Amino acid sequence: MEHLSKRILVVDDDQGILDSFEVLLGDRYDLVMTDNGYEALRIIETKPPRLVFLDIKMPGLDGMDVLKRLRKDQKKVEVVIITATHREETEREAKSLGAIDFLMKPLNIVEVERIASQILS
């Protein structure tokens, strides 16, 4: 199944983050949002995005587990990790699994827009 060229998936259990992405990018991109890792994997399978902003700490299936499954299944999607807690070993592991960037919360809107524009243009 082909991905939509401007589709972004945002995965975060914080509704405020999801709302921020909607305000920031909703008028320019096809945003799909979810608050859990299991739903994220289902969306990636059925409505493949080109870019995923993925929170690390979530109940159930966390962001690192989602990233590991994506790589195991050889899904070709760009992933940007977003997190409130920075640990160098987590960043290294995420990047070794193919994450293209690692952003700290609170998110820098200029950086989010730059990444979306760079990947989706």
Residue ranges and their predicted role:
Residues 105:
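A Lys-centered signature of the CheY-like receiver
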Residues 47-53:
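Active-site beta3 strand of CheY-like receiver
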Residues 58:
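Receiver (REC) domain active-site loop signature in two-component systems and cognate sites
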Residues 65, 86-101, 114:
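Alpha4 helix (beta4-alpha4-beta5 surface) of REC/receiver domains from two-component response regulators
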Residues 42, 64-74:
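Short amphipathic alpha-helix used as the core "switch/output" element in two-component signaling
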Residues 35-39, 62-65:
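Acidic catalytic/metal-coordinating carboxylates
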Residues 82-84:
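Hydrophobic/aromatic residues positioned on beta-strands within the core alpha/beta folds
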Residues 15-32:
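Two-component/phosphorelay signaling modules centered on CheY-like receiver
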